[in-house]
């Protein structure tokens, strides 16, 4: 089996050893390619810290981590940046949209960086926004968008370069049920591909039906894994 993420004995703490705060405690987790995994648990249990470590935005204090078959710790800083840019897409709760760019231009930023022609990049971005129900907002500035619309722009920007691993922190938190369903349908379409994987942190029970695996977290640890609805349906049909 090919893995998107293999984490073994991962710990993350903040502060000095005598007064440190442990966010992750010797955590083990495997996520396969072709899988949509969800992390659930109470606020402060370590979910966002875990995906930040996976995304390379934080270094683990202890343990071994493989992402898409690579060990980020063995890479130079420049190599890590290039690896993330080519292979990962992530959406966190701070969207960081560029205020002077339209919705479509914000989505197209990764393509601009990759050297795409502007017209082609913006058209691709507009098509993706249309999939997320925002065809009528592609020319809007971030200040003209609601929080939920900004969230969808951030999602589209994370997906525009077809990343192998998508990492999302509460991707439906600002969305109504219909818009949230559209976002999750798109993520599920990505995850069903054998060379792609998606990790979602969520408190939204409405989206659990899209999960292949649900990892329950508490106090910096994964307490148990649960087969999601999709895996349950596959088992029933076998």
Question: Which residues make up each language-model segment?
Answer:
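Intrinsically disordered, low-complexity glycine/proline-rich and charged
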Residues: 216, 223-224
């Amino acid at each position: 089996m090919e893995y998107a993420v293999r984490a073994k004995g991962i710990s993350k703490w903040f502060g000095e050893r005598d007064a440190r705060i442990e966010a992750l405690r010797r955590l083990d987790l495997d996520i396969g390619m072709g899988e949509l995994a969800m992390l659930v648990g109470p606020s402060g249990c370590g979910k966002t810290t875990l995906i930040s470590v996976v995304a390379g935005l934080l270094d683990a204090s202890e343990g071994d981590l493989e992402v898409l078959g690579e060990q980020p710790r063995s890479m130079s800083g420049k190599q890590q940046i290039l690896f993330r840019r080519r292979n990962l897409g992530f959406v966190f709760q701070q969207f960081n949209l560029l205020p002077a760019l339209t919705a479509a231009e914000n989505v197209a930023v990764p393509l601009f960086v990759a050297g795409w022609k502007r017209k082609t990049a913006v058209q691709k971005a507009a098509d993706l926004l249309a999939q997320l129900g925002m065809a009528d907002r592609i020319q809007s500035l971030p200040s003209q968008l609601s929080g939920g619309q900004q969230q969808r722009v951030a999602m589209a920007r994370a997906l525009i370069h077809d990343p192998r691993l998508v990492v999302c922190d509460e991707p439906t938190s600002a969305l109504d049920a219909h818009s949230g369903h559209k976002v999750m349908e798109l993520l599920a379409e990505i995850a069903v591909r054998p060379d792609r994987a998606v990790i979602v942190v969520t408190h939204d029970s409405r989206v659990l039906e899209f999960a292949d695996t649900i990892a329950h977290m508490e106090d910096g640890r994964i307490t148990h894994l649960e087969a999601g609805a999709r895996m349950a349906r596959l088992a029933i049909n076998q």
